[in-house]
Design a protein with these regions (language model features):
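Catalytic and substrate-binding regions of cell-wall glycan-acting enzymes that process beta-1,4-linked
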Residues: 137, 157-196
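Second-shell loop/turn segments in exported
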Residues: 45-54, 77-80, 103-107, 120-131, ...
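Glycine-rich, acidic and aromatic/proline-enriched surface loops and short helix-turn segments
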Residues: 92-99, 119, 161
Length: 196
């Protein structure tokens, strides 16, 4: 089943859970998207060495399982996102952050699937080196930004550049990395939600 929606339509009234027009992110939908090449990103030849799942498909399943744990989070209502949109957004953020590589490390020290900074991981009470823990921290941090800013683009900017930067600029900061991050995540989210 395909979903026609855009996280850019945040003010639009969305169908409720159980409505036949609101496709759940089922195994069939995941398979369809994977068949279309919309949700498969390579880890560029790296072999995950961390604890937990080893392959990209297993990591993607873990991403969706963790995302499922937060389907009833109040931040989704605050940002006007359905569960399907949340799962697509969360998955896309992880894809862009780490290409599903649990051992990814940035030049500034961000760690793992969600590219959590050590201080952020400490505040969230998660082990950034553990794939599942890292994903829970990433989900909670992204949800906090959705709750604070009420929009997917601003939440992604805050996830990438920090909430202070978004507040200081009154929107997406004019940093090339942050603007690129937001654009890539939203593009992948919308590709996942759209049929081709």
């Amino acid at each position: 089943m395909r979903v026609r929606a855009s996280v850019l339509d945040l003010g639009k009234k969305l169908p409720k859970r159980g409505d036949p027009n609101n496709a759940e992110f089922t195994d069939d939908a995941k398979t369809d998207a994977a068949d279309d090449g919309l949700v498969v990103l390579a880890s560029y030849g790296t072999t995950p060495k961390g604890r937990g799942p080893r392959g990209t498909a297993e990591i993607e399943d873990l991403v969706l399982d963790v995302g499922d744990d937060y389907l009833r989070h109040p931040a989704l209502n605050a940002a006007g996102l359905s569960g399907t949109e949340w799962l697509a957004l969360f998955r896309a953020n992880i894809a862009v952050e780490s290409a599903f590589n649990p051992d990814a490390r940035s030049s500034v020290g961000a760690i793992g699937l969600g590219q959590l900074m050590p201080g952020t991981a400490d505040l969230l009470g998660v082990d950034p080196h553990d794939p599942e823990d890292n994903l829970h921290g990433s989900a909670r941090y992204l949800l906090a930004q959705l709750e604070d800013f009420g929009a997917a683009d601003l939440a992604l900017a805050a996830y990438n550049a920090g909430p202070e930067a978004v507040r200081d600029y009154g929107g997406i900061p004019p940093y090339a990395e942050t603007e690129g991050h937001v654009a890539k995540v939203l593009r992948l989210t919308n590709a996942t939600l759209s049929s081709e």
